[in-house]
Each structure stands twice: as C-alpha cells, then as structure tokens.
C-alpha cells in the first residue's frame, strides 16, 4: 500500500506542476485535492507500518 501511495503522490505532484504551469489550469484544483489525499494516505501508511513493527 505504501508503494501505491507514493506512486499516486508523485502523479499528483506532476499534475500540480502541469496545472500551475498554465498547461492545464482546470487541473490545478484537482491536483491539490489529490495531493493532500495521498499525503494523508502516506502518513497513515507510515504510522500503521510503524505500529506493526515493519520497516517501510
């Protein structure tokens, strides 16, 4: 799950760069939402992995 979270976080960052660069102005709002969703999922994955005792 951590790999998927990081993958989608990178995709959200790329979408944000493209959206804020003026290439796709409408994608900026969506990129912000996706970025924060997957940032939260990343934190949850790290915390749950730490509680289980597994290394990320």
Swiss-Prot record:
Key word Electron transport present: no
Residue ranges crossing the lipid bilayer per the database entry: 6-26, 27-47
A GO CC annotation given for this chain: plasma membrane
Localization, UniProt: Cell membrane
Record membrane topology: Multi-pass membrane protein
Keywords noted in UniProt: Cell membrane, Membrane, Transmembrane, Transmembrane helix
Main location group: membrane
Protein family according to the UniProt entry: Belongs to the UPF0391 family.
Protein name: UPF0391 membrane protein PSHAa0537
């Amino acid at each position: 799950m951590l790999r998927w979270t990081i993958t989608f976080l990178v995709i959200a960052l790329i979408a944000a760069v493209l959206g804020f660069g003026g290439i796709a102005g409408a994608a900026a709002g969506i990129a912000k939402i996706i970025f924060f969703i997957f940032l939260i999922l990343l934190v949850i994955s790290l915390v749950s992995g730490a509680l289980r005792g597994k290394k990320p």
